[in-house]
């Protein structure tokens, strides 16, 4: 039996083509998997900053904007509302916002960058209910100074989102990161991002 010479060049081509087809097959399997695991355009947009024009917002008005699937409240406060805030300090659990759940620029009596605009997450810090905006003094009871009232368990917050003493909510309403460009509010970007 005589052995025929083996053509090594053909064998190398077959091995190279087999490897190439294997890599293409692997890429074909990995692409849909990676596409499935990456967030969609809608999800990326939902997590990004939200721009809100506040130029037409009237004093006393509240707007609700959805950011990252949560309601964000924007309230335009009157000068009287702002002037009343210091008089409530003795009735509040954390009047100076020492418990850290807001950006440093919101650690003031107004809990805001601009005193006339309050920006809060509209989620009660007790069990995640949605408090209602009740700005009129006396709207909940005779001693009510105006603010936010959570009807789930009775938590009360003033017009800076600060919780009153002896309420089920353990902390003030949260302040999301935000900044202003004139009368445009940008929720999701800190003042430091400017």
Q: Predicted segment positions?
A:
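Pocket-edge structural micro-motifs
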Residues: 54, 67, 75-76, 121, ...
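Generic detector of short, well-ordered, non-transmembrane alpha-helical segments enriched
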Residues: 9-10, 65, 120, 146
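Extracytoplasmic/periplasmic/luminal assembly and interaction segments
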Residues: 60-108
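Rieske [2Fe-2S] iron-sulfur-binding domain
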Residues: 90-194
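N-terminal secretory signal peptides and thylakoid transit peptides that target proteins
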Residues: 2-21
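C-terminal segment of N-terminal export signals and the immediately downstream linker at the start
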Residues: 7, 16, 26-66, 70
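Active-site-proximal structural scaffolding
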Residues: 23-26, 171
């Amino acid at each position: 039996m005589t052995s025929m010479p083996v053509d090594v060049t053909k064998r190398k081509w077959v091995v190279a083509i087999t490897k190439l087809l294997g890599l293409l097959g692997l890429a074909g399997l990995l692409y849909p998997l990676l596409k499935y695991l990456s967030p969609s355009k809608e999800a990326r947009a939902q997590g990004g900053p939200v721009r809100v024009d506040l130029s037409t917002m009237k004093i006393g008005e509240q707007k609700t904007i959805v950011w990252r699937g949560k309601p964000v409240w924007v309230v335009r406060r009157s000068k009287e509302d702002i002037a009343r805030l210091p008089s409530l300090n003795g009735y509040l659990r954390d009047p100076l916002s020492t418990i850290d759940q807001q950006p440093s620029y919101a650690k003031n009596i107004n809990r805001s960058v601009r005193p006339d605009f309050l920006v809060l997450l509209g989620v009660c810090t007790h069990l995640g209910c949605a408090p209602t905006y009740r700005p009129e003094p006396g709207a909940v009871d005779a001693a009510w100074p105006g603010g936010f009232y959570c009807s789930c368990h009775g938590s009360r917050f003033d017009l800076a989102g600060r919780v009153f003493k002896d309420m089920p909510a353990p902390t003030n309403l949260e302040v999301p990161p935000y900044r202003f460009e004139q009368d445009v509010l940008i929720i999701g970007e800190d003042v430091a991002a400017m």
